[in-house]
Amino acid sequence: MAGRNVTLRLRVPVRTKITGAGRRRGRRTRIRCGRMKGGFLPALIPLIAAAIGAVPGIASVALQAARH
């Protein structure tokens, strides 16, 4: 794979202006969430979903590397 570059693109939302309404909204969500209910498993569900979503991308990179 000499001479080939692999580029990964990530989309990260960036806020340029934080208004008073935005700050208030963040406080409300923290207060509403409170303590995590349901234990350890609900915290793992988003991580498992992200891993499942990443599998096709990882597999395609592995296949491409194996072909070259």
Swiss-Prot record:
The keyword Iron does not apply. GO terms for molecular function: DNA binding. The record marks 21-22, 39-40 as: Cleavage. One of its GO terms (cellular component) is viral nucleocapsid. Its main location: virion. It comes from the Viruses. It is found in: Virion. Keywords: DNA-binding, Late protein, Virion. Residues 1-21, 40-68 form a propeptide. The role of the precursor might be to condense the viral prochromatin for encapsidation by virtue of the two basic domains. Belongs to the adenoviridae pX family. This is Late L2 mu core protein. It comes from Canine adenovirus serotype 1 (strain CLL).
